[in-house]
Regions:
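Long, intrinsically disordered, low-complexity segments
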Residues: 20-24, 37-40, 121-122, 187-189, ...
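Membrane-proximal, proline-rich intrinsically disordered regions
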Residues: 21-75, 545-555
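Conserved, well-structured interaction surfaces
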Residues: 41-45, 49-54, 89-162, 174-186, ...
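Flexible, polar/acidic helix-loop-strand segments at domain edges
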Residues: 97-108, 112-116, 340-440
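Short coil/turn linking the two alpha-helices of tandem helical-hairpin repeats
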Residues: 159-161, 166, 203, 229-236, ...
């Protein structure tokens, strides 16, 4: 962490109530041994910009770090390590850097992608430490608490991904120390407890002016997520399920948030949460507790929602509302089967292929064949089945066989959209407007359901699951709640939202052979894997540069 070059120039950003801070400040790089002059409000904007931007010059150039700027953004590094190794998605371009190792769960201590995540988190924390150190006593306690929350968030992902962190809560030239497992869990727990009373009240920033800033609701949501995973993070020493439930109760009883339930212009309540105007649509905003702000004009990057939308589309797909097609992430069969256990998803066949078709012709053909996304949703009986299996971009299959490459070897996922629910124009054709809901109310319902289940309160768990299913227009379960019910519901509600690996680990399904999926362990159909893969390795470069850090077991 000591050797990371910290650059604090603030690019144009959705300023989260900090409108005067949006200009480029052209501040020099920070040397831990010096105290350069800078605009404090601009530095606050940069704290939030670490979530949604990668540098000071738009999508590429003057990057925060020396590695591939498009690959180095906060959400993209988290998403890739949480999703590409699971039963949800496959990256089509298996010759890309480190992708086969992630797809097949065969990484080692030289993993480039694990290193990218490690360096991003370390960079962000260093920046937050600098702000907290220099602005405490100068700026209000609630603002300092916001940045302390962001620091907790980054340490949370260190704990989740690596089971340890190079830990510092000061800004100086000393090397970080290693904080592992329960010690790191306890620190995050105590730090969140300390800052929660200092933050603005629950829902204070759930409006157009403050949307994207952290209030007490964001801290409660992170605290609930931390506590739900307590047994994993502390190696079974702590099981804070009651605490997880209590923090969910605080959020739900506040009345500050609500699930997005009402259809609008043909878009379901669920769909609107992931659309390009989810920062203007009051119904979508009410569900979102803490977003990563995105805008096609003001936050141009390749690591946020631009990554989510572009990577899941191929040229020729209708209703894309972007000209940016990467043809990368497609659904594994195992994800589709959470909605279609009999593999009966509506889909076009080889004889239905069109050549050089216009978008209008593709739409007409899909409607004729009854293979539109709406047809898929209707067949699934679940608004969350946001898949495309039509003729646009090529004919898709569900079974890639022994091949994990090729974008049409699985269903296309259209959950993330640049389209605006109100019909207004998109802001840009290349970069997306869609804010990323890092915490949303549906997570609070399912967290409380799982916490209640683990506490033996199955009736209460059932009620919260039914609430989520009702919003999705899915037939509500009525029988006993079990672990399979819970893990499947987590998948249906939160697929491709950057959390699947954590959920599988919590249920004991990621490593071992209890649950197999295509290409788990590098084999079509899947094989069991070692438990060491429940955490990522510490980069060898950090161990070489910091004698305080040790490698995770068996790497």
């Amino acid at each position: 962490m000591r050797n990371i070059l910290i650059k604090t120039a603030v690019a144009g950003f959705l300023c989260l109530g900090l409108a005067s801070c949006a200009d480029d400040l052209n501040i020099s790089s920070i040397d831990p041994q010096s105290s350069p002059s800078y605009d404090a409000d601009g530095l606050l904007a940069k704290q939030y910009a670490t979530l949604g931007l990668t540098g000071q010059a738009g999508p590429a150039g003057k990057g925060d770090m020396s590695q591939d700027e498009g690959e180095s953004g906060f959400y993209r590094v988290i998403f890739n390590l949480q999703e590409l190794c699971t039963d949800e998605v496959i990256w089509a371009w298996q010759t890309d850097t480190d992708i086969p190792a992630i797809t097949n769960i065969a990484w080692n201590s030289s993993s480039v992608r694990a290193n990218w995540a490690y360096q991003r988190l370390a960079y962000d924390i260093t920046l937050h430490n600098q702000f907290i150190s220099e602005q405490t006593g100068k700026m209000s306690d609630d603002v300092i608490a916001e940045v302390r929350f962001l620091r907790c968030l980054n340490y949370y992902y260190f704990l989740d991904l690596f089971h340890k962190a190079p830990f510092k809560d000061t800004f100086d030239s000393e090397l970080p120390v290693e904080k592992t497992g329960k010690d790191l869990y306890d620190w995050i727990d105590k730090e969140l407890t300390a800052i929660e009373p200092q933050l603005k009240e629950v829902g204070a920033y759930n409006d157009e002016k403050g949307f994207g800033r952290a209030d007490r609701g964001a801290a409660y949501a992170l605290h609930a997520r931390l506590a739900l995973n307590s047994a994993v993070y502390t190696d079974g020493q702590v099981k804070d399920y009651k605490k997880a439930k209590d923090y969910c109760d605080k959020i739900l009883s506040s009345g500050a948030y609500a699930l997005s339930t009402e259809a609008k212009n043909g878009f379901t309540g669920y769909e609107q949460v992931f659309m390009g105007d989810n920062d203007q649509n009051t119904q979508a905003m009410k569900e979102i507790i803490f977003p990563i702000r995105q805008d096609g004009k003001k936050t141009q990057e390749y690591s946020g929602s631009t990554y989510l939308v572009a990577s899941m589309r191929i040229s020729g797909m209708p209703n894309s509302f972007t000209s940016n097609y990467w043809s990368c992430n497609f659904a594994r069969k195992d994800l589709v089967e959470k909605f279609f256990p009999k593999d009966n998803i509506p889909m076009a066949g080889e004889n239905d292929a069109l050549k050089d078709a216009t978008e209008e012709q593709v739409i007409a053909k899909d409607e004729e064949l009854k293979v539109t996304t709406k047809d898929v949703i209707n067949k699934a009986g679940d608004d969350r089945a946001m898949f495309y299996m039509g003729v646009g971009g090529g004919i898709r299959t569900l079974s890639p066989g022994k091949q994990s490459t090729g974008f049409t070897n699985g269903a296309s996922i259209v959950k993330w959209q640049n389209r605006h629910a109100d019909g207004s124009d998109i802001h840009d054709g290349i970069f997306m407007d869609t804010d990323i809901p890092l915490f949303r109310l549906a997570e609070i319902y399912l967290t409380r359901a799982e916490a209640n289940y683990r506490l033996g309160n199955t009736t209460d768990a059932l009620a919260d699951i039914q609430t989520i299913q009702k919003r999705a227009n899915r037939k509500e379960i009525s029988g006993a709640v079990d672990e399979q019910t819970l893990i499947d519901e987590w998948c249906r509600e939160f697929y491709v939202e950057g959390r699947r690996r954590s959920d599988l680990i919590r249920f004991g399904l990621f490593s071992g052979s209890k649950y197999l999926w295509d290409f788990k362990g590098g084999v079509a159909g899947g094989i069991g894997i070692e438990s060491k893969f429940n955490v990522y390795p510490i980069p060898v470069t950090d161990i070489a540069g910091n004698p305080n850090m040790t490698q995770n077991p068996n790497y």
